[in-house]
């Protein structure tokens, strides 16, 4: 009977005997993400945004005051295929998707208006029962960010929202702070990892000296296979 021998080695010893010298590293973006990265590298921003929407990437449109976030949002939504079912959640009707017949617009109470106190978080939770293909949220402002992220991550890819921030990095930070407001009892690093795993694209808008609105930056997080 052959007795199995088990060596007691550490990783440094493995390295010393050359165990890692011929290792092949396979960390590849999936084909769709590779195409999107190629579009970005080529400076084809309009085509990148179009293909990202069609590929159902989760998108945040970020910008400061008066940078045209809602206008750009509506322009981007024209790319969404007309056969999809879209639910919008807003505190004022601004999202326009007339080319999509199967749509439902939900509106929250703003500033205590109306007899029923319906928050944005209430709308997000309600819309999940309406079985949307995508969820379009007018603007993320507070703890409803976690409900939005959870909805996006549980069967509603391709969802889009806007957020008030001056850079993609600050947009990520804003999302983290908003989710922390929900009091989930998880660490900041855990929230950061979650946000980075859910949000694929951040489109940053700026307002130029002559009032021209433009896309100043694009953040793109590739998924690996």
Describe the predicted segments one by one.
Residues 2-4, 106-109, 221:
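Generic beta-structure capping elements
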Residues 5-7, 94, 111-112, 224:
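Active-site/binding-pocket entry motifs
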Residues 38-42, 46-66, 71, 75-198, ...:
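Switch/coupling sub-region of P-loop NTPases
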Residues 1-3, 12-16, 118-120, 174-176, ...:
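Surface-exposed beta-strand edges and their flanking turn/coil or helix-capping segments
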Residues 193-225:
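Conserved P-loop NTPase
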């Amino acid at each position: 009977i052959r007795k199995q021998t088990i060596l007691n080695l550490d990783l440094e010893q493995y390295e010393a005997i050359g165990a890692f010298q011929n290792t092949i590293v396979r960390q590849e973006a999936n084909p769709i993400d590779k195409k999107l990265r190629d579009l970005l590298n080529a400076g084809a921003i309009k085509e990148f945004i179009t293909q990202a929407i069609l590929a159902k990437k989760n998108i945040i449109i970020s910008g400061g005051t008066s940078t045209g976030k809602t206008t750009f949002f509506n322009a981007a939504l024209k790319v969404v295929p007309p056969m999809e079912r879209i639910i919008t959640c807003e505190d004022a009707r601004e999202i326009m998707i007339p080319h999509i017949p199967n749509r439902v617009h939900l509106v929250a109470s703003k500033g205590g208006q109306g007899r029923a106190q319906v928050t944005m978080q209430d709308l997000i939770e309600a819309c999940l029962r309406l079985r949307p293909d995508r969820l379009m949220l007018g603007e993320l402002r507070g703890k409803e960010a976690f409900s939005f992220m959870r909805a996006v991550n549980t069967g509603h890819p391709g969802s889009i929202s806007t957020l008030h921030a001056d850079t993609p990095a600050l947009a990520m930070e804003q999302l983290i702070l908003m989710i922390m407001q929900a009091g989930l009892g998880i660490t900041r690093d855990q929230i950061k990892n979650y946000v980075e795993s859910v949000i694929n694209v951040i489109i940053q808008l700026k307002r130029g000296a002559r009032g021209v609105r433009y896309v100043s930056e694009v953040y793109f997080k590739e998924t690996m296979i």
